[in-house]
């Protein structure tokens, strides 16, 4: 299927690209509600309030840390390098970039927060709230931005030819690795296994609300439209819009 050749002004492309970043970012941010509901529905009733607090807190921490150091750690990296600069993000938008810097920061920040949301689900009922927040600051401010910059920021993985679309490795690989490390260090939920290694009855660990967890799954499904569609990073041409669709 071909497209008639069209000419779109830089200003129009700037507007549509920025709108794509913002609208997709809103959908990805809505996934935070999905994670919170899914986790809250699957943990025991006594842990629901802690799960909600952790999900609200990790997003707040991610926003602050990604503004303070995260964005420039990822995008301030020299070509083929390993780490950017420890400086706060500042908006320096121009039409030449093809999109608003602020919309790009927001879109990348919600990806960063999603990485920590992956960890939250694994560590549910395994970790206290303040150590969790401390790790959230480290992951969203340092670990994820550095690994993100290796490819999306033009770092050594990018120059080596590695490609990542929609964070299949950078988001889910980083989040999964951090979650696995946390699970290994912290161990199983207290009281889940007997001294001989056998699994105890699930009665004390019954899910608090399966309908709530189900609603969380549907919200996450909806959020993926922003996560994957927005990763086209452009909506200023027919080809770009077709790719988003």
Residue ranges and their predicted role:
Residues 1-245:
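Hydrophobic alpha-helical transmembrane bundles of multi-pass membrane proteins
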């Amino acid at each position: 299927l071909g497209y008639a050749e069209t000419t779109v002004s830089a200003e129009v492309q700037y507007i549509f690209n920025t709108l794509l970043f913002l609208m997709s970012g809103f959908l990805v941010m809505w996934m935070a509600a999905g994670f919170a509901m899914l986790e809250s529905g699957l943990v025991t009733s006594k842990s629901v309030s802690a799960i909600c607090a952790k999900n609200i807190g990790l997003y707040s921490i991610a926003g602050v840390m990604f503004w303070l150091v995260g964005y420039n750690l990822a995008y301030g990296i020299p070509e083929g390098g390993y780490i950017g600069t420890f400086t706060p993000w500042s908006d320096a938008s121009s039409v030449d970039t093809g999109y608003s810097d602020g919309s790009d920061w927001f879109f990348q920040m919600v990806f960063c927060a999603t990485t920590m949301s992956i960890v939250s689900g694994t560590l549910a009922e395994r970790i206290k709230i303040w150590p969790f927040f401390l790790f959230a600051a480290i992951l969203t401010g340092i670990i994820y931005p550095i690994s993100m910059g290796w490819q999306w920021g033009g770092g050594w993985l990018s120059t080596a030819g590695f490609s990542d679309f929609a964070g299949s490795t950078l988001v889910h690989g980083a989040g999964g690795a951090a979650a696995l490390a946390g699970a290994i260090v912290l161990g199983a939920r207290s009281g889940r296994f007997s001294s001989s290694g056998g699994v105890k009855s699930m009665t004390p660990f019954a899910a608090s609300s399966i309908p709530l967890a189900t609603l969380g799954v549907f919200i996450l499904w909806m959020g993926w439209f922003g996560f994957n569609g927005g990763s086209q990073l452009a909506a200023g041409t027919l080809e770009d819009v077709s790719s988003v669709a």
